[in-house]
Amino acid sequence: MKQIYVHGLGQTSDSWTKTIDILQTTDYSLCPNLPDLVHSKEVTYDNLYAAFSDYCNQYDEPIDLCGLSLGGVLALNYAIQYPKKVRSLVLIATQYKMPKKLLKFQNLLFRFMPKSMFQQMGFRKADFLLLCETMMELDFNNSLHKIS
């Protein structure tokens, strides 16, 4: 059984290191780095989710998913699409319906931030902006019943 911890936007897989150390689950804990999953593809939500799904689907046994913010959205989407492949689901600060006004405001703030602020976060500034834009229409409200 694998435990997959998924970081949020503006974070890296290292964000989970202390948590995993405290839980002492390093033998079966995985922390994919989201920017690495999309490689050279355009950073849209659909591309990121497809890459995340491929990552999770490489494991035959049901997985435990724990996601923070963007990581939670990806984990939720995966649990809806593959409910039999998810043994447990922990969502932290995760929206099942994207707050459009908040995302638009966030993108506005991102536009004024220098590119250098984004370098340590894994994605380029343009990637942040595009990813947030492509998430605005996400709404899992009608699919939540698929998770038991």
Regions found by a protein language model. Give the residues of each.
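Structural cue for short, hydrophobic secondary-structure segments
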Residues: 5-8, 31
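Active-site loop/oxyanion-hole signature of alpha/beta-hydrolase fold enzymes
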Residues: 17-21, 28-64
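Short beta-strand immediately N-terminal to the catalytic nucleophile in serine-hydrolase-like folds
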Residues: 65-67, 92
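Gly/Ala-rich beta-loop-alpha elbow adjacent to hydrolase catalytic centers
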Residues: 67-71, 75
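Conserved serine/cysteine hydrolase catalytic core
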Residues: 133-148
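Active-site glycine-rich loops that stabilize anionic/oxyanionic intermediates
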Residues: 8-11, 69
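Flexible "cap/lid" loop of the alpha/beta hydrolase fold
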Residues: 45, 80-81, 86-116
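Serine-hydrolase catalytic-loop signature spanning alpha/beta hydrolases and amidase-signature enzymes
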Residues: 10-18
